[in-house]
Every structure is written in structure tokens, then in C-alpha cells.
Amino acid sequence: MGKRDYSPFGPDAKRAVESGLTAAEWYHTDVPRKVMKDLMARSDRPAIRDTVLLYGLMLALAVGGILTWGSLWTLPFWLAYGVLYGSASDSRWHECGHGTAFRTSWMNKAVYEISSFMIMRNSATWRWSHARHHSETYVVGRDPEIAVMRPTVLAKLMLNFFGVFDVISFVPKLIHNAFAGPTRVEKTFVPQSEWGKVQRVALIHLALYLAAMALAVWMGSILPLMVVGLPRLYGAWHHVMTGLLQHGGLADNVIDHRLNSRTVYMNPVSRFIYWNMNYHVEHHMFPMVPYHALPRLHQIIKDDLPAPNLSIAAAFAEMWPALKQQLKYEDYFLKRDLPASAKPYREDFHLYVPGIMAPNAAE
């Protein structure tokens, strides 16, 4: 395939459309309709429980950090607060953006807006970028949420464990959105009817961040920014760690989530922070199944999926060598083995690279 162009205006995006890749039908494991209906049933109870616990912990940790400010005892409070602010907000943004976390619509919307502010994402633009991520997952030039591009820029990945590049890219976008609406790239996936909302959201976010900075200046202390803003940097490591494992080192330009997504078994604390998104093949295959039902879905369809990685460490041990290989060979990827009970991958399509050869299925 050669060097990839991730721009939505580049040749890879054009080839993806012309080849039919963007309109292709994705593989789904067969699940009985009655079972799927039960899995997709929404409930307020699990999300209310988890949300009260999350915000309760954040409040307690922030109070502890404020009361111990100026001493070393303050550090553990802010480190824990930061992970909940800078990482748990990512999964809440994600699930509530799908509208599946709560049964009650306004609850999804409220938590989605709060989480979008915390994770430094415009709630209007990112709702649409994530829709594209699901419809064209890791299709080069089309998916705006490809976290691990080829070749991998390892320094950028490392710095993003502290949210550095996310924040650097957020600030100019925030200012552009606030005063000029969506950027040129954002206009490729955000409907024109939403452009005004993009600007309104950006103005609100900008006002809140300016207020926090003004309070910090008035107090002569960074304490207000330890509560709002800075946790997006010092607490980002968990959501970056888990986010890299979603698709890192796997195939791009395919239509089978078993090839481009990864399920990883995680400890209960990480699963709470990540809201069960460690079941990532399952989530991409059936995105309308709520987070609390993903463990059940996994048990039902696991015989049709690659074996999950047994831990975060095991997943990184698998992914890291692949990322290093991609520094030299952009077309290298890990192909996950399927159990004997699974339906096979469609080799005719998965060997296809847009622009190089025509897929056998289309001949």
C-alpha cells in the first residue's frame, strides 16, 4: 500500500470511497433476535449507581486535596482525582454519546456534556466523529479517530500518556470552533445543521476554562486548575493506556471487527474506569448493547472471536512488537487467530488493499 495518508482530503480517503470500502457490509456474529433484544435492553440503575460513585469519589478526593494543599499528603488525592477526571470521563463521554448508558435520555445527555467538557472534546463535533469511527472503523482517510497511525510516532504516544498532544490540538480547535465554527476537517463529518451548536458548545467551554484561569490568577494559586483543566493532563494515562489497546497493531481497511479490534480482560478497577470498553470487539460489532451487558455478550459470542488478551500487560506485550515493526513496514499488522468454532475471516477481502488490487469478491 505504501505510505498512508490519513487526511480526509487525500488519496486514501478517495480510494476507500471508490473501492466500495466505505459502503461495505461489516461482519457480525449471529445472535438470536430474542437474545439480542434482551442484551440491548436499557436500564438507569447500573449507570446511576456508577455515576453517583464516580462523582462522589471525585468530590471526596477534591475536598481531600484542597484540605491538604501545600503538603505532600495532597499528592495521592490529586493523583486519584486526576484518573477519574482525565480517564473515566473518556468512557462516560463514549457510552453516553451512544445513548446506551442510561435508559433516560436526559441523563445520557447531561453526563455526555459534563464528560465532554472534562475530556476536552466539543460535544457536537465528537458525536459525529465517533459515529464515523463506528461506521468506517480504521479505514484510512475516513476514520477521524485513528489513535495509532502508521508508522507509529512513539514519542507522541508516550507524551500523550500525559495528554500533551490532545491538549495542544484541543486549544486551537476550541478557539476556532468558538469564533468560526467547525474546522475544514470537521465539516467532512459534522452535518451543516449542527455547525451552530459546535460554536455554542465551544463558547461555553472557553468561558469555563477562562473563568478557572481567572480564579487561579486571583487566588495566586494553581489550585482551581487542579480541579478543572490540569487533571486532563496528569490523569490521562489510564484512558490512553486502554485506548491504545483498542486497535493498536491490528489491521486497517477491513470490514471485520475481529481483525481490527481487541478484547482484553481487565481488573475491576480498570473496568470501572473504562466502563467495560475492554470488551471492544463486542462493542464495535454491537454498539447498541449497553456497557453493563457487554460481559454477557462476550460470553455468548466468544466462540466466534479471537481469544481475548488475558491482561493489560499481555495485550501490550502483543501490541508493542507490532508497533515497532510498523516503523519499518507500514503494511505489517497482527492477524488474530480464530478458534475452530468461529466463522473464518473473508480472506478475499482482507487481503485487499485499496488502490493496489481489486477484491476478488468484486470481480
At which residue positions do the language-model features occur?
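Non-catalytic, topology-defining segments of multipass membrane proteins
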Residues: 1-82, 92, 117-225, 291-363
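Short acidic-hydrophobic sequence patches enriched in Asp/Glu that either
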Residues: 46, 102-110, 125, 229, ...
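Active-site-flanking alpha-helical
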Residues: 61, 97, 101-102, 254, ...
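Membrane-embedded alpha-helical segments that form the functional core of polytopic membrane enzymes
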Residues: 67-93, 110, 114-124, 229-236, ...
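Transmembrane alpha-helical segments that form the membrane-embedded catalytic/substrate-channel core
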Residues: 83-93, 122, 167-173, 227-255, ...
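Histidine-centered catalytic micro-motifs
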Residues: 89-99, 126-138, 242-249, 273-289
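Aspartate-rich (DDxxD/NDxxD/DxxxD) Mg2+/diphosphate-binding motifs
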Residues: 91-110, 138-146
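Active-site-proximal inter-transmembrane loops
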Residues: 185-193, 257-279
